[in-house]
Design a protein with these regions (language model features):
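Intrinsic, low-complexity N-terminal interaction/targeting segments
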Residues: 2-16, 82-83, 274-277
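Gly-rich Lys/Arg/Thr-decorated short loops/hinges at beta-loop-alpha junctions or inter-strand turns
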Residues: 17-24, 174-176, 283-290
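Small-residue-enriched alpha-helical segments and adjacent helix-cap loops
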Residues: 20-165, 191, 289-431
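Terminal amphipathic helices with adjacent charged low-complexity linkers/tails
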Residues: 68-69, 205-250, 269-278, 334-339
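Mobile "lid/hinge" segments at catalytic clefts and subdomain interfaces of large enzymes
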Residues: 131, 135-223, 419-470, 474
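Short, C-terminally biased terminal segments at protein or domain edges
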Residues: 250-268
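Active-site cores of enzymes that catalyze phosphoryl transfer or operate on phosphate-rich substrates
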Residues: 267-292, 297
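Long hydrophobic segments that form regular secondary structure
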Residues: 283-287, 297-318, 461, 467, ...
Length: 497
């Protein structure tokens, strides 16, 4: 065995889970090429696994491994760029891009070269291997499919065609990073990221002596305070006086200025399905196609098939999204119909109106020691029920609803989706059932009436969606509809016969 088992795994250091070993492959920028798809297909064949999963960081993970990846497999992964040559830094290559970087009609800055430069910086510095393997940096080019609301430690958001706004993770676990009143030119971004990562390293060396777990960036910032943290960063930058971090969200709460207005107009894509389906690119006569992977699962034949489609009809690129879906890009208009047919033949969905596009679920009791319920199975059961009984189409159809988000969590950690969903089902260890939260409101009309046994979930959620369709006011959001229902009314809706 060559690997030590880890809490947060990478290619070289798997984690022990209830269903076996868990390994994650970092995909910097979330973009795969055809050769990497071939390597993934071979990896699935070698390990005997049915599928690989796209994660909510736009990486890939393998579950239920019976042993560590051997040397030959790791060599194949490093040869094609799916693993780092230096095992010390493999796990910190969490680099998230806007999934439509370089092809988005509304994009302000193409962030791909900047992200590539950051990856080169990380992989050349073994000393940064001390950072948490959850450490992540996001690059948002200001296009229609944004990632500024994803819970990265650092995010750079393009605010015009020359500058980025710096965001840092300061809040609670799973919270989106916040602006810190620093604007950077393109050439200033890499030095700033380097200074922050080195300052984070110093903090780990200090706090890690007594910490029970490796400190996250937010822990280091909390220890020194935002001002103190920025002072150390400034020293790393040779004392640039204009880089003083401030909690800009707090300042905007008192009154917003021009900068706040500019950022307010940026499209946030929380649980956004807008990238699914066919979309025109910034390049003439080129389109991208967003494809649903139910619960992020991507089986061997689909890996092979999408790789062949990307090579034959696109530019060879397959883009992973933090919503656990896939984008095929650079397709000619004349080939769209054929590509859609090929995708359908692979058993995949390329529209935003399928129930599978609404669902997020953690590993649950089948794969995690903390899971109280089998979230994967229960989410699939709900998806099948909704698909058989409803047409979930936000553009029209038998049941017209805006895309909702439904989150199954086996415990209170919310690993699959850190931010609030429209409907959340929390695994309850005492009852092995689900506690239900709807738009932030829990059905508490009587003790334990907020608890749903797994077999009751599909009908209850179906009742709620149907009630929203039939009883809502014109243009009323799901959250507004559920907020104006009393606990008794919600209970009656959920448990209607």
């Amino acid at each position: 065995m060559i690997a030590e088992h880890a809490i947060c795994p990478d290619s070289y250091h798997p984690a022990v889970a209830r269903d076996g070993l868990l390994t994650r492959l970092r995909i910097p920028g979330g973009v795969l090429n055809v050769a990497q798809c071939v390597a993934i297909e071979q990896l699935l064949a070698t390990t005997g696994l049915d599928y690989i999963q796209v994660t909510n960081r736009a990486n890939l993970q393998l579950r239920a491994l019976t042993k560590d990846l051997d040397r030959d497999v790791l060599t194949a992964l490093t040869d094609c760029g799916l693993a780092a040559n230096d095992r010390a830094v493999d796990g910190i290559r969490n680099i998230m891009l806007s999934p439509t970087a370089g092809i988005d009609l509304q994009e302000l800055i193409d962030v791909r070269s900047l992200a590539a430069a950051w990856h080169d910086y990380l992989t050349d510095r073994s000393e940064l291997g001390i950072l948490s393997t959850k450490f992540s940096v996001g690059f948002d080019g200001g296009g229609s499919v944004g990632i500024v609301d994803r819970p990265n430690d650092i995010t750079l958001l393009a605010v015009n065609d020359r500058e980025f706004e710096l965001y840092l993770s300061i809040g609670n676990r799973g919270s989106a990073p916040i602006p810190v009143d620093v604007r950077l030119g393109v050439d200033e971004c890499l030095p700033m990221l380097a200074a922050i990562s080195q300052t984070y390293r110093y903090g780990i060396e200090l706090l890690g002596r007594t910490a029970r777990r490796k400190p996250r960036l937010r822990d280091v910032i909390e220890h020194w305070g935002l001002t103190g943290f920025s002072e150390i960063v400034r020293r790393e930058l040779a004392g640039s006086s204009r880089f003083i971090f401030k909690n800009l969200d707090e300042q905007r709460g008192a009154g917003s200025g021009e900068r706040g207005t500019e950022l307010k107009n940026h499209t946030l894509n929380r649980d956004n399905n807008d990238h699914l389906g066919i979309h025109q690119q910034s390049q003439p006569d080129r389109y991208y196609l967003g494809i649903v992977l139910p619960l992020g699962r991507w089986n061997r034949s689909q890996v092979k098939g999408l790789g062949e489609i990307a090579e034959g009809y696109g530019s060879g690129a397959i883009r992973l999204t933090p919503w656990q879906n896939i984008i095929l890009s650079d397709i000619k208009s004349a080939d769209l119909e054929r590509v859609q047919l090929l995708i359908t033949e692979l058993g995949l969905i390329h529209t935003a109106n399928h129930p599978s596009s609404l669902l997020r679920a953690c590993a649950g009791s089948s794969g995690c020691q903390f899971g109280a319920t089998d979230t994967q199975r229960d989410a699939i059961d709900l998806s099948n029920y909704l698909a058989a009984n409803f047409t979930l189409d936000h553009l029209g159809g038998a049941l017209r609803v805006r895309p909702l988000s439904i989150h199954f969590s086996g415990c209170d950690k919310s690993c699959a989706q850190h931010d609030r969903a429209d409907i959340t089902l929390w695994g309850d260890e005492r009852t092995r059932s689900y506690r239900l939260a709807i738009g932030g409101i829990t059905d508490r009309s009587e003790p334990d009436q907020s608890v749903l046994a797994p077999p009751a979930v599909p009908i209850a959620i179906g009742n709620l969606i149907a009630a929203y369709h039939h009883q809502r006011h014109p243009q009323e959001s799901f959250e507004s509809f559920t907020t104006r229902q009393s606990p008794v009314q919600l209970h009656q809706i959920l448990h209607a016969v």
